[in-house]
Amino acid sequence: MPRVHAIEDYRNFGIMAHIDAGKTTTTERILYYTGKSHRIGEVHEGAATMDWMEQEQERGITITSAATTAFWNGKRLNIIDTPGHVDFTIEVERSLRVLDGAVCVLDSNQGVEPQTETVWRQGDKYKVPRIVFANKMDKTGADFFKCLQDIIDRLGAKPVAIQLPIGSESNFKGLIDLVRMKAVVWTDESLGAKFEDAEIPEDLLEQAKEYREKMIEAAVELDDDAMAAYLDGNEPEEATLKRLIRKAVLTGAFYPVLCGSAFKNKGVQPLLDAVVDYLPSPVDVPAIKGIDDDGNEVVRQADDKEPLALLAFKIMDDPFVGTITFCRIYSGVLQSGTGVVNSTREKKERIGRMLLMHANNREDIKEAYAGDIVALAGLKEARTGDTLCDPAKPVILEKMEFPEPVIEIAIEPKSKADQEKLGVALAKLAAEDPSFRVSTDIESGQTILKGMGELHLDIKVDILRRTYKVDANIGAPQVAFRERITKRAEVDYTHKKQTGGTGQFAAVKFIVEPNEPGKGYEFESKIVGGAVPKEYIPGVEKGIESVLSSGVVAGFPVVDVKVSLIDGKYHDVDSSALAFEIASRAAFREALQKGKSVLLEPIMKVEVVTPEDYTGSVIGDLNSRRGQIQGQDMRGNANVINAMVPLMNMFGYVNNLRSMSQGRATFTMQFDHYAEAPANVSAEVQKKFA
């Protein structure tokens, strides 16, 4: 079946914003006016089409990005709704990774908020072309011009108004389209579906002329001919103006700003027009790069004729279909029933059902093309960030980077039935979200959940309870300590047990020394002449490994240690692999004591982005947390402070930073390295755990 929509007519875009700026409502209205939704879902009623997890509908925040296809003016829109909460930035990152453009929604009462800064920076990182929608113009305190100033002051970006509001707060009637120099007014009784062009109100004409001139001056800077014509007194025609604004969006020269009130159904259709006119199609953005089998860089153009390459950017568990993998097709054509290779994991997969998603409704399709965002059912191996491709032309697309989890909690199921359900549920949750990890504490047998923040883990626990009906007790958040030796130690140990009949005998001699940081555990047998027979060496290794998970300082895993078996003795009758395992365990524990084991704590690389006024307070606070300031620089008009801080001193930091900066500073942190804990910290931890 041939392609219905030319790839030039695709717009793959996301809607990004601070929590509560009206992102989901804006998406709802887009679905309503593009004819995909017959009833408008209100977020505050808990009925929004895009927010389909129970947790989202209750909390009124969007947690998982839902992908939706809609149509406007003959163009095909693939929309991704992204969360605005700081603990879910992984979702925003992976959405931006597969999108070509974005609409940044601002609350025109609040202007640019902390999380707007975070998502804007993520947009900068992936060079995503953006337009800005100043939403909630009907709200008390709405100020379109403050939004423009905020974009300059807080994002360090260049905004250009291409619309102006007519009235504000409860008098918000419509907008002035500066490109066409027409007023656009909505009729209240038609739920915003009907609007009409009108002449610009007399009292706003001067302001409109002033802002149109600013817009034209910014646009003609991008084209010498248009600039020359403008200097000769000729204003660019509408088509030329649109072409230049589009060029600005694609190059990041400036960001067009529109206005409206999604909740009051005003301004959504012109926003859709702007998406079509100014945001890029898949062929307008740089082609994706990857690496072939030989490690050479290859480029995949957005073209059906190129070899097939798609990127899995989200995994979801669907109660009806099973595992759904959301993929962006970068090149080639994908057909259901074909075999592909998961080049990231070197596994073969067969494409079963292919679905086009609309929030949580779905449509089966047989074929998908370059530029499409599709959901694939039944993939066994795929994980977020994996590449699927043509087996004849393998490629690994750029890997997504996922931050290390920084916080962990223990979870204990209340019954045997809960234990079984928990295992299945956690495997699914970990597959869906790469920033969520699960492990087992060998000592206590407890299951440990690791995540990006407290809300992140709260939501996971909530999903376990509701979706998977697991009843469990949750522990307090903990830090993952480690242990290592600091000096070389030599030990000689003999295990002897004679109790009539067959006894036990094994003697080992070890040299144990610190390994290079990050090298982990290494074992080497230097036995010559059969002092310890070969068949007993696995027993020796097993004995050492049983101690690695629980060191002698406070019972934490031992890292970066090298063990050499240099000598030993055995008995023809009484020796066995088990005897050597017991001897090695005791010898290694003795070596850890002799080698002066110390406690290591995780050190986090912390980046705080703060308005300059709060720099002194932020640095003082980081110092009080045993932080070491690595440097500062300016980003836009914000100060960026980089520091190394022990994780144990970072609990509750988000709330401190928020109150210290009136919510204007944001921070990110990720694991950097382990370092020896000071004596007082080590003593405190030993008292608690040893």
UniProtKB/Swiss-Prot annotation:
Compartments (UniProt record): Cytoplasm
UniProt: GTP binding residues: 17-24, 81-85, 135-138
Parts of the chain that traverse the membrane: none
GO cellular component, one term: cytoplasm
Coiled-coil intervals: none
Molecular function terms from GO: GTP binding; GTPase activity; guanosine tetraphosphate binding; translation elongation factor activity
Annotated PROSITE patterns: G_TR_1 (PS00301), G_TR_2 (PS51722)
Keyword check for GTP-binding: yes
Keyword Cell cycle listed: no
InterPro entries per record: EFG_II, EFG_III, EFG_III/V, EFG_IV, EFG_V, EFG_V-like, EFTu-like_2, G_TR_CS
Alphabetically ordered keywords of this record: Cytoplasm, Elongation factor, GTP-binding, Nucleotide-binding, Protein biosynthesis
Residue intervals of the tr-type G domain: 8-283
GO BP, sorted A to Z: ribosome disassembly
Function recorded in the entry: Catalyzes the GTP-dependent ribosomal translocation step during translation elongation. During this step, the ribosome changes from the pre-translocational (PRE) to the post-translocational (POST) state as the newly formed A-site-bound peptidyl-tRNA and P-site-bound deacylated tRNA move to the P and E sites, respectively. Catalyzes the coordinated movement of the two tRNA molecules, the mRNA and conformational changes in the ribosome.
Family classification: Belongs to the TRAFAC class translation factor GTPase superfamily. Classic translation factor GTPase family. EF-G/EF-2 subfamily.
Protein name per the record: Elongation factor G
Gene transcribed to yield this protein: fusA
